[in-house]
Protein backbone atom coordinates (compact mmCIF):
# COMPACT_ATOMS: atom_id res chain seq x y z
CA UNK A 1 0.00 0.00 0.00
CA UNK A 2 1.33 3.40 -1.02
CA UNK A 3 1.62 5.85 1.87
CA UNK A 4 2.03 9.62 1.91
CA UNK A 5 5.35 10.98 0.55
CA UNK A 6 6.77 11.79 4.01
CA UNK A 7 6.21 8.23 5.23
CA UNK A 8 7.53 6.76 1.98
CA UNK A 9 10.72 8.81 2.28
CA UNK A 10 11.15 7.73 5.90
CA UNK A 11 10.74 4.06 4.96
CA UNK A 12 13.35 4.44 2.23
CA UNK A 13 15.85 6.28 4.44
CA UNK A 14 15.46 4.09 7.52
CA UNK A 15 15.66 0.92 5.42
CA UNK A 16 19.02 2.15 4.16
CA UNK A 17 20.24 2.80 7.71
CA UNK A 18 19.15 -0.68 8.83
CA UNK A 19 20.86 -2.37 5.90
CA UNK A 20 24.06 -0.44 6.61
CA UNK A 21 23.80 -1.49 10.29
CA UNK A 22 23.53 2.11 11.49
CA UNK A 23 20.03 1.82 13.00
CA UNK A 24 18.87 1.59 16.61
CA UNK A 25 15.46 1.33 18.29
CA UNK A 26 14.25 3.28 21.32
CA UNK A 27 11.13 1.62 22.75
CA UNK A 28 8.83 3.54 25.07
CA UNK A 29 5.87 2.55 27.23
CA UNK A 30 3.47 2.77 24.28
CA UNK A 31 5.05 -0.30 22.71
CA UNK A 32 4.41 -2.33 25.87
CA UNK A 33 0.90 -0.98 26.42
CA UNK A 34 -0.12 -2.49 23.09
CA UNK A 35 0.29 -6.01 24.56
CA UNK A 36 -2.07 -5.29 27.45
CA UNK A 37 0.14 -3.75 30.11
CA UNK A 38 -1.53 -0.79 31.79
CA UNK A 39 -0.33 2.79 31.48
CA UNK A 40 1.97 4.31 34.08
CA UNK A 41 -0.93 6.47 35.29
CA UNK A 42 -3.18 3.43 35.74
CA UNK A 43 -0.38 1.64 37.55
CA UNK A 44 -0.05 4.45 40.09
CA UNK A 45 -3.79 4.94 40.59
CA UNK A 46 -3.99 3.02 43.92
CA UNK A 47 -0.85 4.79 45.13
CA UNK A 48 -2.41 8.17 44.41
CA UNK A 49 -5.63 7.22 46.20
CA UNK A 50 -3.69 6.13 49.27
CA UNK A 51 -2.17 9.60 49.69
CA UNK A 52 -5.41 11.42 48.84
CA UNK A 53 -4.67 12.41 45.23
CA UNK A 54 -6.46 11.81 41.93
CA UNK A 55 -4.08 10.39 39.32
CA UNK A 56 -6.24 11.87 36.54
CA UNK A 57 -5.39 15.34 37.81
CA UNK A 58 -1.65 14.68 37.96
CA UNK A 59 0.71 15.33 35.06
CA UNK A 60 3.96 14.72 36.93
CA UNK A 61 3.81 11.02 37.80
CA UNK A 62 7.46 10.91 38.88
CA UNK A 63 6.67 13.42 41.62
CA UNK A 64 3.52 11.47 42.50
CA UNK A 65 5.61 8.34 43.13
CA UNK A 66 8.01 10.45 45.21
CA UNK A 67 5.14 11.84 47.31
CA UNK A 68 4.07 8.30 48.13
CA UNK A 69 7.58 7.39 49.28
CA UNK A 70 7.76 10.57 51.36
CA UNK A 71 4.49 9.67 53.08
CA UNK A 72 5.88 6.20 53.85
CA UNK A 73 9.22 7.27 55.33
CA UNK A 74 11.06 6.59 52.08
CA UNK A 75 9.66 3.08 51.73
CA UNK A 76 8.80 2.14 48.13
CA UNK A 77 8.03 -1.53 48.73
CA UNK A 78 4.43 -1.34 47.54
CA UNK A 79 5.43 0.39 44.30
CA UNK A 80 8.07 -2.27 43.73
CA UNK A 81 5.45 -4.98 44.18
CA UNK A 82 3.06 -3.27 41.76
CA UNK A 83 5.81 -3.21 39.11
CA UNK A 84 6.62 -6.87 39.71
CA UNK A 85 2.97 -7.94 39.60
CA UNK A 86 2.11 -6.00 36.45
CA UNK A 87 5.14 -6.59 34.26
CA UNK A 88 5.64 -10.23 35.24
CA UNK A 89 2.30 -11.14 33.69
CA UNK A 90 2.59 -13.42 30.68
CA UNK A 91 1.46 -11.65 27.54
CA UNK A 92 1.70 -12.36 23.83
CA UNK A 93 4.14 -10.40 21.74
CA UNK A 94 2.70 -7.94 19.25
CA UNK A 95 3.58 -8.06 15.58
CA UNK A 96 5.60 -4.88 16.15
CA UNK A 97 7.83 -6.63 18.68
CA UNK A 98 8.29 -9.56 16.32
CA UNK A 99 9.23 -7.39 13.36
CA UNK A 100 11.65 -5.27 15.39
CA UNK A 101 13.34 -8.47 16.56
CA UNK A 102 13.57 -9.87 13.03
CA UNK A 103 15.20 -6.74 11.62
CA UNK A 104 19.03 -6.78 11.44
CA UNK A 105 19.26 -4.23 14.24
CA UNK A 106 21.83 -4.73 16.97
CA UNK A 107 21.03 -1.93 19.43
CA UNK A 108 17.82 -1.51 21.44
CA UNK A 109 17.26 1.11 24.15
CA UNK A 110 14.19 1.21 26.36
CA UNK A 111 12.82 2.83 29.50
CA UNK A 112 10.45 -0.13 29.97
CA UNK A 113 10.91 -2.59 32.82
CA UNK A 114 9.33 -5.56 31.01
CA UNK A 115 11.19 -8.23 29.05
CA UNK A 116 9.26 -8.12 25.80
CA UNK A 117 12.19 -7.05 23.62
CA UNK A 118 14.37 -9.81 25.06
CA UNK A 119 11.56 -12.34 24.56
CA UNK A 120 11.06 -11.27 20.94
CA UNK A 121 14.78 -11.60 20.21
CA UNK A 122 14.89 -15.00 21.88
CA UNK A 123 12.00 -16.24 19.74
CA UNK A 124 14.05 -15.26 16.68
CA UNK A 125 16.92 -17.36 18.05
CA UNK A 126 18.97 -14.24 18.63
CA UNK A 127 21.27 -13.85 21.62
CA UNK A 128 20.42 -10.68 23.55
CA UNK A 129 23.02 -9.07 25.79
CA UNK A 130 20.81 -7.29 28.33
CA UNK A 131 22.15 -4.35 30.34
CA UNK A 132 20.38 -2.69 33.29
CA UNK A 133 23.22 -2.17 35.79
CA UNK A 134 26.44 -0.22 35.44
CA UNK A 135 28.57 -3.33 36.01
CA UNK A 136 26.87 -5.12 33.12
CA UNK A 137 28.24 -2.54 30.69
CA UNK A 138 31.74 -3.90 31.31
CA UNK A 139 30.87 -7.44 30.19
CA UNK A 140 30.01 -8.86 26.78
CA UNK A 141 27.87 -11.93 26.16
CA UNK A 142 29.51 -14.40 23.79
CA UNK A 143 28.20 -14.34 20.20
CA UNK A 144 25.57 -11.74 21.00
CA UNK A 145 23.28 -10.60 18.21
CA UNK A 146 21.90 -7.51 19.93
CA UNK A 147 22.39 -5.34 23.00
CA UNK A 148 19.30 -4.31 24.97
CA UNK A 149 19.93 -1.30 27.22
CA UNK A 150 17.24 -1.00 29.92
CA UNK A 151 18.15 2.42 31.22
CA UNK A 152 15.47 2.45 33.93
CA UNK A 153 15.95 -1.09 35.19
CA UNK A 154 14.40 -4.54 34.97
CA UNK A 155 11.14 -5.99 36.30
CA UNK A 156 12.94 -8.68 38.30
CA UNK A 157 14.84 -6.02 40.25
CA UNK A 158 12.14 -3.40 41.01
CA UNK A 159 13.97 -1.97 44.02
CA UNK A 160 16.71 -0.79 41.64
CA UNK A 161 14.33 0.63 39.04
CA UNK A 162 14.43 4.32 38.18
CA UNK A 163 11.04 5.35 39.42
CA UNK A 164 10.79 8.26 41.85
CA UNK A 165 12.16 11.79 41.78
CA UNK A 166 15.15 10.80 43.91
CA UNK A 167 16.16 8.25 41.26
CA UNK A 168 16.02 10.80 38.47
CA UNK A 169 17.99 13.37 40.45
CA UNK A 170 20.77 10.86 41.13
CA UNK A 171 20.74 9.34 37.64
CA UNK A 172 23.45 11.52 36.13
CA UNK A 173 25.86 10.38 38.86
CA UNK A 174 24.78 6.82 39.61
CA UNK A 175 24.11 5.84 35.98
CA UNK A 176 26.55 8.13 34.20
CA UNK A 177 27.95 5.29 32.03
CA UNK A 178 24.46 4.83 30.55
CA UNK A 179 24.28 8.52 29.74
CA UNK A 180 27.62 8.27 27.96
CA UNK A 181 26.61 5.08 26.12
CA UNK A 182 23.31 6.53 24.90
CA UNK A 183 24.96 9.81 23.97
CA UNK A 184 27.46 7.87 21.86
CA UNK A 185 24.74 5.88 20.13
CA UNK A 186 22.74 9.04 19.40
CA UNK A 187 25.80 10.42 17.65
CA UNK A 188 26.72 7.29 15.67
CA UNK A 189 23.35 5.61 14.98
CA UNK A 190 20.00 6.58 13.52
CA UNK A 191 17.27 6.00 16.11
CA UNK A 192 13.63 5.16 15.59
CA UNK A 193 11.59 6.10 18.66
CA UNK A 194 8.50 3.88 18.99
CA UNK A 195 5.85 4.27 21.69
CA UNK A 196 7.78 7.11 23.30
CA UNK A 197 6.34 10.35 24.68
CA UNK A 198 9.63 12.25 25.26
CA UNK A 199 8.55 13.27 28.76
CA UNK A 200 11.39 11.35 30.41
CA UNK A 201 13.79 13.77 32.18
CA UNK A 202 16.81 11.54 31.60
CA UNK A 203 16.35 11.35 27.85
CA UNK A 204 15.69 15.07 27.66
CA UNK A 205 18.96 15.68 29.50
CA UNK A 206 20.90 13.36 27.16
CA UNK A 207 19.38 14.83 24.00
CA UNK A 208 20.24 18.31 25.25
CA UNK A 209 23.86 17.26 25.84
CA UNK A 210 24.16 15.88 22.32
CA UNK A 211 22.53 18.99 20.87
CA UNK A 212 24.90 21.28 22.79
CA UNK A 213 27.92 19.34 21.57
CA UNK A 214 26.92 19.02 17.91
CA UNK A 215 24.53 21.96 17.44
CA UNK A 216 23.59 21.94 13.74
CA UNK A 217 25.55 18.76 12.98
CA UNK A 218 23.30 16.35 14.88
CA UNK A 219 22.42 13.00 13.33
CA UNK A 220 18.88 12.58 11.99
CA UNK A 221 16.51 10.46 14.10
CA UNK A 222 12.84 9.55 13.68
CA UNK A 223 9.81 9.06 15.90
CA UNK A 224 6.33 7.74 15.19
CA UNK A 225 3.38 9.45 16.87
CA UNK A 226 -0.38 9.42 16.33
CA UNK A 227 -2.08 12.68 15.48
CA UNK A 228 -4.54 14.06 17.98
CA UNK A 229 -8.18 13.09 17.51
CA UNK A 230 -11.23 14.70 18.99
CA UNK A 231 -12.55 12.80 22.00
CA UNK A 232 -16.26 12.07 22.52
CA UNK A 233 -18.05 15.10 23.99
CA UNK A 234 -14.83 17.16 23.89
CA UNK A 235 -15.22 20.89 23.37
CA UNK A 236 -13.87 22.21 20.07
CA UNK A 237 -11.64 24.66 21.91
CA UNK A 238 -10.09 21.89 24.02
CA UNK A 239 -9.43 19.77 20.95
CA UNK A 240 -7.82 22.67 19.11
CA UNK A 241 -5.65 23.31 22.16
CA UNK A 242 -4.34 19.73 22.13
CA UNK A 243 -3.70 19.90 18.38
CA UNK A 244 -1.73 23.12 18.79
CA UNK A 245 0.26 21.65 21.66
CA UNK A 246 1.18 18.63 19.53
CA UNK A 247 2.31 20.94 16.72
CA UNK A 248 4.59 22.79 19.14
CA UNK A 249 5.89 19.48 20.52
CA UNK A 250 6.79 18.27 17.02
CA UNK A 251 8.53 21.56 16.32
CA UNK A 252 10.50 21.24 19.55
CA UNK A 253 11.72 17.76 18.62
CA UNK A 254 13.28 19.23 15.50
CA UNK A 255 15.78 21.01 17.78
CA UNK A 256 17.28 17.56 18.33
CA UNK A 257 16.99 16.70 14.62
CA UNK A 258 14.23 14.22 15.38
CA UNK A 259 11.90 13.96 12.39
CA UNK A 260 8.34 13.21 13.49
CA UNK A 261 6.21 10.90 11.37
CA UNK A 262 2.57 11.64 12.21
CA UNK A 263 0.22 8.68 11.81
CA UNK A 264 -3.56 8.50 11.52
CA UNK A 265 -3.74 5.40 13.73
CA UNK A 266 -1.44 3.03 15.57
CA UNK A 267 -2.01 0.25 13.02
CA UNK A 268 0.14 2.24 10.63
CA UNK A 269 3.18 1.49 12.81
CA UNK A 270 2.85 -2.19 11.95
CA UNK A 271 2.37 -1.40 8.26
CA UNK A 272 5.47 0.80 8.24
CA UNK A 273 7.61 -1.78 10.03
CA UNK A 274 6.39 -4.47 7.64
CA UNK A 275 7.36 -2.30 4.68
CA UNK A 276 10.84 -1.77 6.13
CA UNK A 277 11.24 -5.50 6.73
CA UNK A 278 10.04 -6.35 3.23
CA UNK A 279 12.40 -3.80 1.69
CA UNK A 280 15.31 -5.40 3.51
CA UNK A 281 14.30 -8.97 2.76
CA UNK A 282 13.87 -8.31 -0.97
CA UNK A 283 17.56 -7.41 -1.12
CA UNK A 284 18.33 -11.02 -0.15
CA UNK A 285 17.61 -13.68 -2.76
CA UNK A 286 17.09 -17.39 -2.19
CA UNK A 287 18.53 -19.38 -5.10
CA UNK A 288 16.74 -22.72 -5.35
CA UNK A 289 17.71 -25.42 -7.81
CA UNK A 290 19.33 -28.77 -8.47
CA UNK A 291 20.41 -30.42 -11.69
CA UNK A 292 22.08 -33.52 -13.05
CA UNK A 293 21.25 -32.33 -16.56
CA UNK A 294 20.34 -28.94 -17.98
CA UNK A 295 17.51 -29.38 -20.50
CA UNK A 296 18.50 -27.86 -23.87
CA UNK A 297 21.57 -26.24 -22.33
CA UNK A 298 25.08 -27.54 -22.84
CA UNK A 299 26.59 -28.28 -19.42
CA UNK A 300 29.26 -25.65 -19.91
CA UNK A 301 26.68 -23.00 -20.84
CA UNK A 302 24.46 -23.89 -17.88
CA UNK A 303 27.37 -23.61 -15.48
CA UNK A 304 28.26 -20.25 -17.02
CA UNK A 305 24.63 -19.09 -16.66
CA UNK A 306 24.46 -19.94 -12.93
CA UNK A 307 27.92 -18.45 -12.35
CA UNK A 308 27.12 -15.19 -14.13
CA UNK A 309 23.65 -14.85 -12.58
CA UNK A 310 25.09 -15.18 -9.07
CA UNK A 311 27.87 -12.76 -9.90
CA UNK A 312 25.44 -10.19 -11.30
CA UNK A 313 23.10 -10.43 -8.30
CA UNK A 314 26.02 -9.63 -5.99
CA UNK A 315 27.16 -6.81 -8.27
CA UNK A 316 23.66 -5.32 -8.03
CA UNK A 317 23.94 -5.36 -4.20
CA UNK A 318 21.73 -8.36 -3.58
CA UNK A 319 22.70 -10.94 -0.98
CA UNK A 320 22.30 -14.64 -1.75
CA UNK A 321 21.11 -17.58 0.35
CA UNK A 322 21.54 -21.06 -1.12
CA UNK A 323 21.12 -24.66 -0.05
CA UNK A 324 24.05 -25.86 -2.16
CA UNK A 325 21.84 -27.83 -4.56
CA UNK A 326 23.55 -30.48 -6.68
CA UNK A 327 24.73 -29.11 -10.02
CA UNK A 328 23.85 -25.54 -9.00
CA UNK A 329 25.35 -24.65 -5.61
CA UNK A 330 29.04 -24.84 -6.51
CA UNK A 331 28.57 -22.48 -9.47
CA UNK A 332 26.66 -20.05 -7.23
CA UNK A 333 29.63 -19.99 -4.86
CA UNK A 334 32.12 -19.45 -7.68
CA UNK A 335 30.13 -16.55 -9.12
CA UNK A 336 29.70 -14.85 -5.76
CA UNK A 337 33.33 -15.24 -4.72
CA UNK A 338 34.62 -14.00 -8.06
CA UNK A 339 32.59 -10.80 -7.77
CA UNK A 340 33.39 -10.22 -4.10
CA UNK A 341 37.05 -11.12 -4.14
CA UNK A 342 38.21 -10.18 -7.63
CA UNK A 343 36.09 -7.08 -8.25
CA UNK A 344 35.07 -5.73 -4.82
CA UNK A 345 38.24 -6.74 -2.99
CA UNK A 346 36.51 -8.08 0.11
CA UNK A 347 34.50 -11.07 1.28
CA UNK A 348 31.54 -10.33 3.53
CA UNK A 349 29.89 -13.33 5.20
CA UNK A 350 26.47 -11.65 4.91
CA UNK A 351 26.63 -11.55 1.10
CA UNK A 352 26.46 -15.34 0.72
CA UNK A 353 24.79 -17.65 3.24
CA UNK A 354 25.10 -21.37 2.53
CA UNK A 355 23.02 -24.04 4.23
CA UNK A 356 24.09 -27.46 2.88
CA UNK A 357 21.45 -30.06 3.66
CA UNK A 358 22.19 -32.72 6.30
CA UNK A 359 22.61 -36.22 4.93
CA UNK A 360 21.11 -39.52 6.03
CA UNK A 361 17.68 -40.46 7.35
CA UNK A 362 17.90 -38.10 10.29
CA UNK A 363 18.85 -35.31 7.91
CA UNK A 364 15.80 -35.90 5.72
CA UNK A 365 13.56 -35.31 8.71
CA UNK A 366 15.21 -31.92 9.20
CA UNK A 367 15.05 -30.79 5.59
CA UNK A 368 11.81 -28.88 5.98
CA UNK A 369 13.25 -27.02 8.97
CA UNK A 370 16.42 -26.24 7.01
CA UNK A 371 14.42 -24.94 4.07
CA UNK A 372 12.31 -22.71 6.27
CA UNK A 373 15.39 -21.39 8.06
CA UNK A 374 16.97 -20.40 4.74
CA UNK A 375 13.89 -18.92 3.13
CA UNK A 376 12.82 -16.86 6.16
CA UNK A 377 15.99 -14.79 5.68
CA UNK A 378 14.98 -13.76 2.16
CA UNK A 379 12.30 -11.87 0.28
CA UNK A 380 12.75 -13.18 -3.26
CA UNK A 381 13.09 -16.83 -4.35
CA UNK A 382 14.53 -17.72 -7.76
CA UNK A 383 14.01 -21.27 -9.07
CA UNK A 384 16.36 -22.91 -11.58
CA UNK A 385 16.07 -26.34 -13.26
CA UNK A 386 14.97 -28.79 -10.53
CA UNK A 387 15.85 -32.36 -11.38
CA UNK A 388 17.71 -35.27 -9.76
CA UNK A 389 18.53 -38.96 -10.18
CA UNK A 390 16.09 -41.41 -8.61
CA UNK A 391 16.53 -45.15 -9.20
CA UNK A 392 18.75 -44.45 -12.18
CA UNK A 393 16.24 -42.10 -13.84
CA UNK A 394 16.25 -38.31 -14.14
CA UNK A 395 13.14 -37.05 -12.34
CA UNK A 396 11.82 -33.68 -11.26
CA UNK A 397 13.11 -32.58 -7.86
CA UNK A 398 10.34 -32.41 -5.28
CA UNK A 399 12.65 -30.45 -2.99
CA UNK A 400 12.54 -27.46 -5.32
CA UNK A 401 8.74 -27.72 -5.34
CA UNK A 402 8.78 -27.70 -1.52
CA UNK A 403 10.96 -24.60 -1.50
CA UNK A 404 8.49 -22.88 -3.83
CA UNK A 405 5.59 -23.74 -1.50
CA UNK A 406 7.46 -22.49 1.58
CA UNK A 407 8.51 -19.32 -0.24
CA UNK A 408 4.95 -18.45 -1.19
CA UNK A 409 3.72 -19.36 2.30
CA UNK A 410 6.27 -16.95 3.78
CA UNK A 411 5.23 -14.16 1.37
CA UNK A 412 8.39 -14.26 -0.73
CA UNK A 413 8.22 -13.13 -4.34
CA UNK A 414 8.58 -16.32 -6.39
CA UNK A 415 10.59 -16.14 -9.63
CA UNK A 416 10.67 -19.48 -11.48
CA UNK A 417 12.92 -19.32 -14.54
CA UNK A 418 10.88 -21.50 -16.87
CA UNK A 419 13.53 -21.41 -19.60
CA UNK A 420 15.70 -23.73 -17.48
CA UNK A 421 13.08 -26.49 -17.66
CA UNK A 422 11.98 -29.25 -15.28
CA UNK A 423 10.31 -28.16 -12.01
CA UNK A 424 11.21 -24.53 -12.77
CA UNK A 425 9.09 -24.70 -15.95
CA UNK A 426 6.18 -26.30 -14.08
CA UNK A 427 6.37 -23.54 -11.48
CA UNK A 428 6.55 -20.85 -14.18
CA UNK A 429 3.37 -22.27 -15.76
CA UNK A 430 1.63 -22.27 -12.39
CA UNK A 431 2.53 -18.64 -11.62
CA UNK A 432 1.76 -17.52 -15.16
CA UNK A 433 -1.73 -19.04 -15.01
CA UNK A 434 -2.44 -17.35 -11.66
CA UNK A 435 -0.28 -14.27 -12.10
CA UNK A 436 -2.63 -11.93 -10.23
CA UNK A 437 -2.51 -14.25 -7.21
CA UNK A 438 1.27 -14.20 -7.05
CA UNK A 439 1.75 -10.60 -8.21
CA UNK A 440 -1.40 -8.61 -7.39
CA UNK A 441 -1.46 -5.23 -9.06
CA UNK A 442 1.51 -5.98 -11.32
CA UNK A 443 1.79 -3.75 -14.37
CA UNK A 444 2.26 -4.71 -18.02
CA UNK A 445 6.04 -4.36 -17.79
CA UNK A 446 6.26 -6.94 -15.00
CA UNK A 447 3.95 -9.29 -16.87
CA UNK A 448 6.10 -8.99 -20.00
CA UNK A 449 9.34 -9.58 -18.10
CA UNK A 450 7.87 -12.62 -16.37
CA UNK A 451 6.88 -14.01 -19.75
CA UNK A 452 10.46 -13.67 -20.95
CA UNK A 453 11.64 -15.89 -18.07
CA UNK A 454 10.18 -18.80 -20.06
CA UNK A 455 11.81 -17.84 -23.37
CA UNK A 456 14.31 -20.57 -24.27
CA UNK A 457 15.50 -18.57 -27.27
CA UNK A 458 17.14 -15.91 -25.08
CA UNK A 459 20.91 -15.88 -24.80
CA UNK A 460 22.53 -16.35 -21.41
CA UNK A 461 23.15 -12.63 -21.14
CA UNK A 462 19.59 -11.74 -22.15
CA UNK A 463 18.05 -14.17 -19.67
CA UNK A 464 20.25 -12.91 -16.83
CA UNK A 465 19.38 -9.30 -17.66
CA UNK A 466 15.68 -10.19 -17.61
CA UNK A 467 15.96 -11.89 -14.21
CA UNK A 468 17.92 -8.97 -12.75
CA UNK A 469 15.47 -6.39 -14.10
CA UNK A 470 12.51 -8.33 -12.70
CA UNK A 471 14.11 -8.76 -9.27
CA UNK A 472 15.15 -5.10 -9.13
CA UNK A 473 11.53 -4.07 -9.70
CA UNK A 474 10.52 -6.28 -6.78
CA UNK A 475 13.18 -4.82 -4.48
CA UNK A 476 12.09 -1.27 -5.27
Curated annotation (Swiss-Prot):
Changing residue 112 to A: No longer confers resistance to phage. Loss of NAD(+) hydrolase activity, no longer binds NAD(+), oligomerizes correctly. No change in NAD(+) levels during SPO1 infection, still dimerizes in response to signal. It catalyses: NAD(+) + H2O = ADP-D-ribose + nicotinamide + H(+). It holds the Pfam family STALD. Residues 284-476 are annotated as: SLOG (STALD) domain, binds 3'cADPR. 3'cADPR binds at residues 289-290, 326, 357, 371, 388, 399, 403. It comes from the Bacteria. One of its GO terms (molecular function) is hydrolase activity. Its EC number is 3.2.2.5. It is found in: Cytoplasm. NAD(+) binds at residues 23, 114, 152. CDD domains: SIR2-like. Keywords: Antiviral defense, Cytoplasm, Hydrolase, NAD, Nucleotide-binding. Changing residue 371 to A: No resistance to phage SPO1, no oligomerization in absence of signal, a little bit of dimer seen in response to signal. The keyword Glycoprotein does not apply. GO terms for cellular component: cytoplasm. GO terms for biological process: defense response to virus. Residues 4-283 form the Deacetylase sirtuin-type domain. Activated by a molecule generated by endogenous ThsB (AC J8G8J6) or ThsB' (AC J8CSK2); activation in vitro is 50-100x more sensitive to 3' cyclic ADP-D-ribose (3'cADPR) than 2'cADPR. 3'cADPR activates the NADase function of ThsA by binding to the SLOG domain, which changes its tetramer organization, allowing NAD to access the active site. Also activated by a signal molecule generated by B.dafuensis TIR1 (AC A0A5B8Z670) and TIR2 (AC A0A5B8Z260), and by BdTIR (AC I1GTC2), a plant protein involved in defense against bacterial infection. Disruption phenotype: When this gene is missing the Thoeris system does not confer phage resistance in B.subtilis. The active site is at 152 (proton acceptor). Belongs to the soluble Thoeris ThsA family. Homotetramer formed by dimer of dimers; homooctamers are occasionally seen. Not seen to interact with ThsB. In the absence of the signal generated by ThsB, 63% monomer and 20% homotetramer; in the presence of the ThsB signal product 40% of the protein is dimeric. Homotetramer in solution; probably dimerizes via the N-terminal sirtuin-like domain. Has an N-terminal deacetylase sirtuin-like domain (SIR2, residues 1-283) and a C-terminal SLOG (STALD)-like domain (residues 284-476). The SIR2 domain has NAD(+) hydrolase activity. The SLOG domain binds 3'cADPR; binding alters the protein conformation, allowing NAD(+) to access the active site. NAD(+) hydrolyzing component (NADase) of the Thoeris antiviral defense system, composed of ThsA and ThsB. Activated by a signal molecule generated by endogenous ThsB (AC J8G8J6) or ThsB' (AC J8CSK2, probably 3'cADPR), by TIR1 and TIR2 from B.dafuensis or by BdTIR from B.distachyon (AC I1GTC2, probably 2'cADPR). Upon activation binds and hydrolyzes NAD(+), leading to cell death and inhibition of phage replication. Not seen to bind DNA. Activation is 50-100x more sensitive to 3' cyclic ADP-D-ribose (3'cADPR) than 2'cADPR. This is NAD(+) hydrolase ThsA.
Amino acid sequence: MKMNPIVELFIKDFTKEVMEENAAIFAGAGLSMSVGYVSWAKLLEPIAQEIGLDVNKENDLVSLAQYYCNENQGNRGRINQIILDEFSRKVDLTENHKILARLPIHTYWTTNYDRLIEKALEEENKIADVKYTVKQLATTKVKRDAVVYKMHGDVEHPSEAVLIKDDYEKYSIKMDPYIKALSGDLVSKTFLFVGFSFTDPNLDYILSRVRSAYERDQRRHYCLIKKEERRPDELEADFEYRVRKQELFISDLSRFNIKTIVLNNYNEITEILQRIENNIKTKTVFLSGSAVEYNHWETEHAEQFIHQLSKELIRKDFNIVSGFGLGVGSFVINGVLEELYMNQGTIDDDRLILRPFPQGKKGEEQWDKYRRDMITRTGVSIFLYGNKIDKGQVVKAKGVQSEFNISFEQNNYVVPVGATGYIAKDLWNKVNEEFETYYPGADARMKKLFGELNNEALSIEELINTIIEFVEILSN
